[in-house]
């Protein structure tokens, strides 16, 4: 009944930096050709959304943020064959067109149709589907899920198991997949290896789960908040250390803990250049691999001693855990349904959508791992 019509609904809008999101009534236009309109039913509050609000991640405002979600297809535009109305779906901030070099290479996963690099805040045709008070509102990284309805390109949505609980599998849209894949897909952690995970938030805990699933013999959690250690050990960390407890740099501490060898794999899941260097220099000088998972602020630059690379270390970045989104998300949902991994321990708070700013307060204060908002 709503197909082909403008839908009026609630959305949380970021009008300006460092201000609470504002719940407004917006108009959501019908999907154009090759686009899909989705009724969002559950969405997670992620640090990347907070980076936009704080100005660390520069994006055009006003904007509907949110990118980790699950919902049901309301209607589709002309030419869409991958989903139909009524399908349960997850929006994809890392799209998969299947045609570009990254999509066609077995090594790649960052499709050229992504809006991560350009940050245009618009649909592929250069326009928006959102308006509020007569003003055009920007989209966020091909998704925009802090709204009852959103419109995405068909490259940015995938159908999932209809029996999946959306309030849990929404985490597969970003946080869980990013961390789990960093270990399984990007680093390709080997059985018996030693891993160090810097940052034990939701994504960091998902890295821990990935390291455990890959068969790592030691998984060392690193965080300055010792309150996170019990949960990290529950998820698979074999030991946890607080850099503030030591007089020497944390990379030296990790060398001491590994008989002077360094770790096989390290993961920076904070988004700070200082910890990226610490994680990198914690690795075995020749065999070690360090993966940057945390999103750094726009203006950050890294200075390091190139001899650290010369000896043979590998330094890698990773987006969405290295997964090809359309290929991997349905399989990850199926794996969850088959109890191959758990998501419940990552979800510390479930709130109604109207309490979205409370969700961000919990994130900023370090009191939550993941807050899921329910519509």
Curated annotation (Swiss-Prot):
Pfam families membership: ADH_N, ADH_zinc_N
Entry keywords, A to Z: Acetylation, Cytoplasm, Metal-binding, NAD, Oxidoreductase, Zinc
CDD domains: alcohol_DH_class_I_II_IV
Listed SUPFAM superfamilies: GroES-like, NAD(P)-binding Rossmann-fold domains
Entry binding sites for Zn(2+) 2: 97, 100, 103, 111
Catalytic activity: a primary alcohol + NAD(+) = an aldehyde + NADH + H(+); a secondary alcohol + NAD(+) = a ketone + NADH + H(+)
Cofactor remark: Binds 2 Zn(2+) ions per subunit.
Localization in the cell: Cytoplasm
Listed EC numbers: 1.1.1.1
A GO cellular-component term linked to this record: cytosol
Gene3D superfamilies: Medium-chain alcohol dehydrogenases, catalytic domain, NAD(P)-binding Rossmann-like Domain
Keyword Transmembrane found: no
Residues binding NAD(+): 199-204, 223, 228, 293-295, 370
Lineage: superkingdom: Eukaryota
Entry cofactors: Zn(2+)
Gene Ontology molecular function: any one: all-trans-retinol dehydrogenase (NAD+) activity
Modification N-acetylserine, positions: 1
PROSITE patterns membership: ADH_ZINC
SMART domains xrefs: PKS_ER (SM00829)
Entries under PANTHER family matching the protein: ALCOHOL DEHYDROGENASE, ALCOHOL DEHYDROGENASE 1A
Annotated family: Belongs to the zinc-containing alcohol dehydrogenase family. Class-I subfamily.
Descriptive protein name: Alcohol dehydrogenase 1
Species this chain originates from: Naja naja (Indian cobra)
């Amino acid at each position: 009944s709503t197909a082909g019509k403008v839908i009026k609904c609630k959305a949380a809008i970021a009008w300006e930096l460092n201000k609470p999101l504002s719940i407004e009534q917006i108009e959501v236009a019908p999907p154009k050709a090759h686009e899909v309109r989705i009724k969002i039913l559950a969405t997670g509050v992620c640090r990347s959304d907070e980076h936009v609000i704080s100005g660390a991640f520069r994006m055009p405002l006003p904007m509907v943020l949110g990118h980790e979600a699950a919902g049901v297809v309301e209607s589709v535009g002309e030419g869409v064959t991958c989903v139909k109305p009524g399908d349960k779906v997850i929006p994809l901030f890392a799209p998969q067109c299947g045609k570009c070099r990254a999509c066609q290479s077995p090594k790649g996963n960052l499709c050229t149709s992504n809006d991560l690099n350009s940050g245009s805040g618009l649909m592929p045709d250069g326009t928006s589907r959102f308006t509020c008070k007569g003003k055009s509102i920007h989209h966020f990284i091909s998704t925009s899920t802090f709204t009852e309805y959103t419109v995405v390109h068909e490259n940015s949505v995938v159908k999932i198991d209809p029996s999946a609980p959306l309030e849990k599998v929404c985490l597969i849209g970003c946080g869980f997949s990013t961390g789990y894949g960093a270990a399984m897909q990007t680093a390709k952690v080997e059985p018996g290896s030693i891993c160090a995970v810097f940052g034990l938030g939701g994504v960091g805990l998902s890295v821990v789960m990935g390291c455990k699933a890959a068969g790592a013999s030691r998984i060392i959690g690193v965080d300055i908040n010792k309150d996170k250690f019990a949960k990290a050990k529950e998820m698979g960390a074999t030991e946890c250390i607080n850099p503030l407890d030591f007089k020497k740099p944390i990379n030296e501490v990790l060398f001491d803990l590994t008989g002077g060898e360094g770790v096989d794999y390290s993961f920076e899941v904070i988004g700070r250049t200082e910890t990226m260097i610490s994680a990198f220099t914690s690795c075995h000088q020749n065999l070690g691999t360090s993966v940057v998972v945390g999103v750094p602020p726009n203006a950050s630059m890294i200075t390091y001693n190139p001899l650290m690379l010369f000896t043979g270390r590998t330094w890698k970045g990773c987006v969405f855990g290295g997964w090809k989104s359309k290929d991997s998300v349905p399989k990850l949902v199926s794996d969850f349904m088959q109890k191959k991994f758990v998501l419940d321990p990552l979800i510390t708070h479930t709130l109604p959508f109207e309490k979205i700013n409370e969700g961000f307060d919990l994130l900023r204060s370090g009191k939550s791992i993941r807050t899921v908002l329910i519509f």
